[in-house]
Structure formats: C-alpha cells, structure tokens
A protein has these predicted regions:
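Conserved small-residue packing positions in alpha-helical repeats and bundles
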Residues: 91, 120-123
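Flexible helix-coil transition and linker loops at the boundaries of alpha-helical arrays
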Residues: 146-153, 243-253
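Extended amphipathic alpha-helical coiled-coil/heptad-repeat regions
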Residues: 150-235
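N-terminal J-domain/J-like co-chaperone modules of DnaJ/Hsp40 proteins
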Residues: 1-48, 72-75
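Alpha-helical repeat scaffolds
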Residues: 101-107, 131-142, 168-172
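Alpha-helical segment of the N-proximal tetratricopeptide repeat
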Residues: 85-109, 209-231
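Conserved small/polar residues in nucleotide/adenosyl-binding loops
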Residues: 254-260
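Helix-turn-helix repeat elements of alpha-solenoid scaffolds
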Residues: 93-102, 128, 132, 230-244
Length: 260
C-alpha cells in the first residue's frame, strides 16, 4: 500500500506520536548523511515488511510538508505505528527483529488504542484485510479511542471533529485496495453503505453510459436497434455481474439498470 510504503512518518523514521523535536532531529540527521553521500536508516523503516526507502533531501522536505497541518498528521497517522504503552515497546522489539507474528500476539493481549492501531497497520502490511477491518471497526466505533487518538497525535488544544475519521480511513483503503475486496469483511452497516456507494456508482455510471449510446440508435431502423442491443448486452455484462455481488436482485437501483 502506497500510504504505508511512502508514509511521511516512516520516511522521517518516527512513530505517529513522536515529539516534533525527534522528527526534526531525524530530518537533520538525514540531511547530514545525504550531504556526504551516505544513506541513513531507522528501525521504523521495517525493511523486512516494506520496500526499502530511497531518501533524498527533497523527499525528506516533502515528508515534513505533508505533516504541516493537523488534519494531514491525523490522516497519515491512521496508517502508521503509534507507541504509548510499555506493551508497545515489547511488541516493537519483536517487530524490528522480524517477528511480526509475535508482535501481533502481544498487541492482542490487551485492547487499547495503540494495540488496535498497530494491529491494523500490521494486518495491512500482511494484506490481512479481514483482521484490519475487524480491529478498525472496534477502534473507530469507540469515541473515547478516537478522541485519545487525536489528542495523542496533535495534542488537546485543537477542536478536531472525529466523526468522519472512519470514512477517511475507508476511502483510503478503497482507493488503494478496492471496495470489492473490503466489503466481504465489513459488518458495520454504515461502513457497508459507504463502501457500497463507492463500489456501485462507477458500475452504474458505466451501464448508464452504454444505455445512452444504445438509445442514440432510436429511429435508425430495426437492424441498427438490434445491433445496439447486442452491443449493450456485451458492454454491460461484466458491470451487471459485479453489481449482483454488491446488491440484491430486488434492489431498485440494480433492477432499474438490469431492466434497461
């Protein structure tokens, strides 16, 4: 996933809740190394699980720029590691040693914000979308966790609205993974509806476009209409089959397009 691979927190070698001074210290270290032609690495590069990072002065500056605004800090933090408890310290020691399964086992021992968040990231790294969604539904379904998440990342001074954090998380997943891969694992009804809309709309739009093209043959004779009908059937077959996977056959939206 691009948002993991190129996460600005990862490039700067920090946790999402690391102090700003630590971020700046790592940035300055990078600049010093790069100036003499040396590469620099950090434990949070986790090269055992993600592709190696090609750091440049420009990419380091870009990473800092991406973390300027609180909303961007939160967005990228939704897809990176956080460390707030002694249990996290133990788990990260295993993670850095290449023992991601042991790290996950430790985080599974206690439900808390950092454990859930880190389990989400580990699951996404391993393409374990079922586990990622399961943990995310618990985390994003708990307002206390969300408020704690925001205050841990950006402090308590701001007035950050946490109500849309879940949908922001889902939107990124849909863009990077695809709605169809996520839907089977989702149990939250509002999440299903949100992802369903993102998955269905492009299919409906493509069907409607094909219908509009077919309707342009109206009045051009029976052969033209017959050919248009055959073309419509071919061009919409895959989209309609995909719609069947998202919608029940008695759904108004589906039956309307299927009938057309």
């Amino acid at each position: 996933m691009n948002i993991l691979q190129n996460n600005p927190y990862r490039l700067l070698g920090v946790y999402s809740n690391s102090p700003t001074k630590e971020r700046l210290a790592n940035h300055n270290r990078m600049k010093a190394f790069l100036k003499v032609g040396k590469s620099v690495s950090f434990p949070l590069d986790v090269p055992q699980y993600l592709s190696s990072i090609n750091r440049t002065e420009a990419s380091a500056a870009d990473a800092e720029a991406k973390l300027t605004l609180p909303k961007d800090q939160i967005l990228h933090a939704q897809f990176w590691f956080i460390k707030t408890t002694p249990l996290d310290e133990v788990a990260f020691n295993h993670l850095f040693a290449g023992e991601i399964e042991k790290a996950e086992e430790i985080w599974q021992k206690r439900e808390c914000l950092s454990a859930l968040q880190n389990r989400i990231v580990c699951a996404l790294i391993r393409n374990g979308y079922d586990s990622a969604i399961m943990c995310a539904e618990v985390l994003y379904g708990n307002t206390q966790y969300l408020n704690q998440f925001v205050s841990t990342i950006i402090g308590t001074g701001g007035n950050f609205d946490v109500s849309n954090l879940a949908f922001s998380f889902l939107d990124i997943l849909c863009d990077e993974i695809g709605a169809s891969k996520l839907l089977p694992f989702i149990t939250n009804s509002s999440w299903k509806e949100h992802i369903g809309e993102k998955a269905v709309k492009p299919l409906v739009d493509s069907i409607q476009e094909a219908i509009n093209i077919a309707q342009k043959t109206k009045g051009k004779g029976s052969n033209a209409r017959l050919n248009a009908g055959e073309t419509l059937r071919r061009n919409t077959r895959n989209a309609i089959l995909q719609l069947k996977g998202f919608l029940s056959t008695n759904c108004l939206l589906y039956t309307s397009d299927a009938a057309d």
